[in-house]
A protein has these predicted regions:
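A near-ubiquitous, low-amplitude feature marking generic local secondary-structure context
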Residues: 23, 64, 99, 125, ...
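Alpha-helical architecture
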Residues: 24-27, 42, 133, 152
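Short, well-ordered beta-strand segments
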Residues: 20-23, 199
Length: 199
């Protein structure tokens, strides 16, 4: 399954030699090991390791200095940045007012997206999120500003990716589609329409 995940990443994620990735996740976790060490190593991506606890302030400093092309993260990191730095700004009276005007709404949302992209270094292709469920409020916001993110699902025993989708085709609220060479069954009386556990 490690080989299958590596082949999938090399075939579908499209990162090139010399591009940059900041390693936020622990190497003791399969998600971090696979997608912040093995995949970047195989694709020739430069990996920058954070030697401190990845607090939002430290992450912001490192992203500004390294300007990564790929960001692999757990939801907690993204949620902290969005909940503490972005969502409070949207509660201001004039911002709420502008968001109710169709033309200004779109322009303001694109401006907000650009600011968030810059907060993550300004040149990444996407943020791949996994390891836990993404907060609904944060995901709804990211989708509304057309932020380049995707959410995958996996477990250690599967090497670790089970599902993933490119951010252009990713549907908010999902965890992507089954990765190549992976078979998935949903434990549900109606797996097409009723939520169930992935087996």
């Amino acid at each position: 399954s490690m080989w299958s995940n590596l082949k999938y990443a090399l075939d579908k994620m499209g990162y090139n030699p010399g591009e940059r990735l900041v390693s936020i996740l622990t190497m003791a976790h399969m998600y971090g090991l696979a997608f912040e060490l093995i995949y970047p190593f195989a694709s020739g991506t430069h990996v920058y390791f954070i030697s401190k606890t990845p607090a939002p302030k430290i992450i912001n400093e490192i992203f500004s200095a390294v300007r990564p092309n790929l960001i692999v993260a757990v939801p907690l990191i993204i949620e902290k940045i969005i909940k503490h730095r972005v969502l409070p700004q949207l509660e201001k009276f004039h911002i709420k007012l502008f968001l109710k005007i169709p033309y200004l709404n779109r322009r303001l949302r694109l401006s907000i997206r650009d600011k968030i992209v810059n907060a993550f270094g300004g040149r990444f292709k996407l943020i791949a999120i996994g390891g836990a469920a993404l907060n609904f409020e944060v995901e709804k916001f990211l989708s509304s500003v057309q932020f380049p993110y995707t959410v995958g699902y996996g477990m250690t025993e599967c090497g670790p990716a089970i599902s993933y989708d490119d951010w252009h085709t990713f549907k908010a609220g999902s965890c992507g589609k089954a990765v190549d060479r992976m078979e998935i069954a949903i434990n549900s009386s109606d797996p097409e329409n009723i939520v169930g556990e992935i087996l």
